Amino acid sequence: MRIVFDIGGSVLVPDDPDIDFIKAIAYELTKISEDHEVAVVVGGGKVARKYIKAAKTFTPNETFKDYIGIHITRANAMLLIAALGEKAYPFVVQDFRKAWEVIQLKKIPIMGGTHPGHTTDAVAALLAEYLQADLLIVVTNVDGVYDSDPRKNPNAKKLDRITVDQLVDIAMEGESKAGGSGVVDALAAKFIQRGKIRTYIVGKKDAYSLFDVIKGKHSGTVVEP
């Protein structure tokens, strides 16, 4: 299979880098790459949102703030590259054609953000579409898709299996400004819909066993194309 992994920045670096988690997913990604083609997109998470919030003091320019977030995602991507060692391409990949070339070299391409206005979820969905991936796995700090934000609604219900149309409807309720923190943003959901990409959305606990996740063994949400 060809698999794209979308690793949330807040999962990788909650406040400080989660060294044990980074080691664990580096091991899992290495193991998976022995039998499958793998590409990874890393988010900015809480650190990016802190920088974006601070920048609001100085500028109302959303595009400028997006660029700040992009730089943070690439710093997080470099951290994962370091953990993967020789298995990863040694530089942060910044376009999809290069990601394809790296895969042909039997290396794992690691990407961060690419363009203002696109979250790393959107980048991952576009990458999966470009690569014609069999599977997109989104690792986030929420253990799946809920019918409302579980961080705000204690009665929110987790959805084990949804259609991509349902994902778009749920995502449309989220915000689209720089630093938005929905499980999957609306633009990413629309790209998943357009690309007809089978997607698993899982939490950090499941991510410790990504080798099982790709087999469908997880407690997250399956998004059917």
Curated annotation (Swiss-Prot):
Pathway of action: Pyrimidine metabolism; CTP biosynthesis via de novo pathway; UDP from UMP (UMPK route): step 1/1
Cellular compartments annotated: Cytoplasm
One Pfam family this sequence matches: AA_kinase
Keyword Cytoplasm included in the entry's annotation: yes
One GO location term (cellular component): cytoplasm
Residue numbers binding ATP: 9-10, 45, 49, 140-141, 146, 149
Binding annotation for UMP: 44, 66, 114-120
Major location category of this protein: cytoplasm
Listed name of the protein: Uridylate kinase
Originating organism: Thermococcus onnurineus (strain NA1)
